[in-house]
Amino acid sequence: MAVEDEAGHAARTAEQKNNPVELVQRCGHRGLTLSTAESLTAGALTSKIAEVPGASAVLLGGVVAYSVGVKRSLLDVSDQLLQDRGAVDPDVAAAMAVGAATRCGTDIGVSTTGVAGPEPHEGKDVGTVYLGLACSVEVVQRLGLTLPAECAEYDDDVSRRKWLAGSLLLDLDGDRAAIRDAAVEGGLKLVEDFLLTEPPGLPHSG
């Protein structure tokens, strides 16, 4: 699966804070639910979304998958993929997002995996972050949405739903805390951008 490397996305997330209220409102107006799978951000993205009053109607759950074993056992990421590529990989990020959505029973899954530092990891430089996004095929088609990367299709044998999932590469600067914060902002921006299509009756923001 090809990965879209958006320098502009990384720059925006470093320069401005994204408002999780917008994300929750957009999901709520569409009747969509969201779940998370976090590695380097370790629950910070979930916590940021949960700060919004009424987020419980949208945010159903999240998995902190810091270890490879948890990515495999709780998010159903392929053991072969993890062995071949390591945890910091575009396809792993996409699979994590699918795993979050299927495990939590949501329409959308978003994930984070990367190297926060201070040392490189698995041959990946500090600041290398992949964000994953997954959405059910039915929702994508019904709302006319477009994922921000070339996607692969995944099947879920349990729910019988089909998923589209892709990933986004961020090349971030700063210390460990700055990289983790920017990854959280990037995750919020990724979902917000995905939901930019305005359904009938939803007022435009700004």
Q: Could you describe each region identified by the protein language model?
A:
Residues 1-206:
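Short alpha-helical segments enriched in small residues
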